[in-house]
């Protein structure tokens, strides 16, 4: 027999420190915590092996393939500063291991099996470099940032949204009324909550009809284009598509999907439909914290964000830096750039492990949402810039005078911040002053400032380097 069976060292085959990475390789950076007594090279090689061609023993069918052509390679390992027994293992995967245009297959290969591996205490996928050759097999976002601005005819400022609350329990008619008031008051978008699908108290078709009525009424009164993110997420792909088709028939501009709970296969299907039929696609990241919140195990959100840009979506929730949900500033801005820009340089201080070239794949607009209100407006405008959606749910509907005045307050605050920025003022330093000045001209804003002046969500961010 030409080989010996038995448990073998992975590092003999899969640890290749001299390997020169190819332009077509998919590169991964894993944070590896080996079990006591397992050397980091062996742990890194094990990850490379188990996520590509390897298995735990030599098999005779190895002789029927070219391992050198198909194997993943751990080509570099470095210790994590300030952490004991934690390493960053860099793995290169040949492009042929992946099906074209399938985020599902990419994840099944790279993170499908290795995370339960005994030789590791914990494993986290920190970043992926997607080569242009692979990027080009994806359609990506249905429209992208510039086309969205052209469709909506809104330029030079962030867009404003609002999630309709209470998220569950309203009837379709009352839900539509809340949508109308917010849009009429000056918001660009309102949003179905991620868990609004089609429940007994409000079936999807009724909701879509009343929301469409609200959109057209608000558009007629304001002369602005309005939208409501109609959540098409459903229990089956067929049902999801039925909802998207109905939205298109109503002529509304945008639908929505929960891409992690719905799954990448469903998401990519919907994104293709949206491009073919002129619908924008808003993406909510429900369930992301289950995957990305642990520092030493799971997948960092920047990887989930890259995957979404490939699968397709025009907006995605990306943290706020200032509200009630997770997000450290530099790291958040790192993956915000990965969503919006065409070319992003490697920058470890922002958690970006690889230079990423998207070769003209359309960009995704980041959405800041969760515990934000008018006092946050200067910070949000400065941090996220124009190409963003700022979403105030409670920060609109919690206004003491009602939804429409709440919307007015947010729009006035936003316009004041954009004007101040364009005049060259420093939003970080003068933000509170800018809001105070604007509230002299807007009783709605003054009332909002009064309600939320003391509210803070003071916890340290977990997403640190």
Swiss-Prot record:
> What broad class of enzyme is this?
lyase
Instruction: Provide the positions where the record notes the PTM N6-carboxylysine.
Output: 191
Q: How is it modified after translation?
A: The disulfide bond which can form in the large chain dimeric partners within the hexadecamer appears to be associated with oxidative stress and protein turnover.
Q: Which sequence positions carry the modification called N6,N6,N6-trimethyllysine? A: 4
- Read off the InterPro entries from this record: RuBisCO (IPR033966), RuBisCo_large_chain_AS (IPR020878), RuBisCO_lsu_C (IPR000685), RuBisCO_lsu_C_sf (IPR036376), RuBisCO_lsu_fd_N (IPR017443), RuBisCO_lsu_N_sf (IPR036422), RuBisCO_lsuI (IPR020888)
Q: Where in the cell is it found?
A: Plastid, Chloroplast
Q: Which cofactor does it need?
A: Mg(2+)
Q: Identify the residues that bind Mg(2+).
A: 191, 193-194
Q: Where is this site: Transition state stabilizer?
A: 324
Free-text cofactor note: Binds 1 Mg(2+) ion per subunit.
Q: Kindly list the GO molecular function terms attached to this UniProt entry.
A: magnesium ion binding; monooxygenase activity; ribulose-bisphosphate carboxylase activity
Where mainly located?
A: plastid
Query: EC?
Result: 4.1.1.39
Further remark: The basic functional RuBisCO is composed of a large chain homodimer in a 'head-to-tail' conformation. In form I RuBisCO this homodimer is arranged in a barrel-like tetramer with the small subunits forming a tetrameric 'cap' on each end of the 'barrel'.
Q: How does the annotation summarize its subunit structure?
A: Heterohexadecamer of 8 large chains and 8 small chains; disulfide-linked. The disulfide link is formed within the large subunit homodimers.
Would you identify the family this protein belongs to, as annotated? Answer: Belongs to the RuBisCO large chain family. Type I subfamily.
The role this protein plays is: RuBisCO catalyzes two reactions: the carboxylation of D-ribulose 1,5-bisphosphate, the primary event in carbon dioxide fixation, as well as the oxidative fragmentation of the pentose substrate in the photorespiration process. Both reactions occur simultaneously and in competition at the same active site.
Q: What is this protein called?
A: Ribulose bisphosphate carboxylase large chain
Q: Which organism is it from?
A: Bauera rubioides
